[in-house]
């Protein structure tokens, strides 16, 4: 239990040197943190930490491990809107922070670049782009629901199945349409 917490918190605090040390000591990059119910790779992806994601993947992190909700790494990568929408929502003040599940991470200009770099790494590592959560949602469902155009495009270009129904009998297209309608209604 203590070992899984050490690696998780090293990733969570984005302490790259400690992550490397722990991985070199044989800490399991696939261990689920029973306290937060997250996997170190999921935390690195959520915080858009490219370097720690690389270290975890090169040390045996499985890109298809699910958390307690059945979410995979692509689900987590899809949960945030793309940078232009985040800037609009947060009014892009200097030093703006975005919620990183249990922490806040700085909203950086290279947010989308990091997102795509991590997405490519995960795809190369054979992460399943059509993995369904316990609610039947694929990463494309989530990216569509959150209006994450960057990830929607990424998934579609790589053959994501647009016909998978979630537990509400919705396809990703339904969520994309609803997302556009919500944005339209906010203007009025």
From Swiss-Prot:
GO terms for molecular function: NF-kappaB binding. SMART domains: ANK. Keywords: ANK repeat, Repeat. The keyword tRNA-binding does not apply. GO terms for biological process: cellular response to tumor necrosis factor. Gene3D superfamilies: Ankyrin repeat-containing domain (1.25.40.20). ANK repeats lie at residues 2-31, 36-65, 135-164, 168-187. This is Putative ankyrin repeat protein FPV230. It comes from Fowlpox virus (strain NVSL) (FPV).
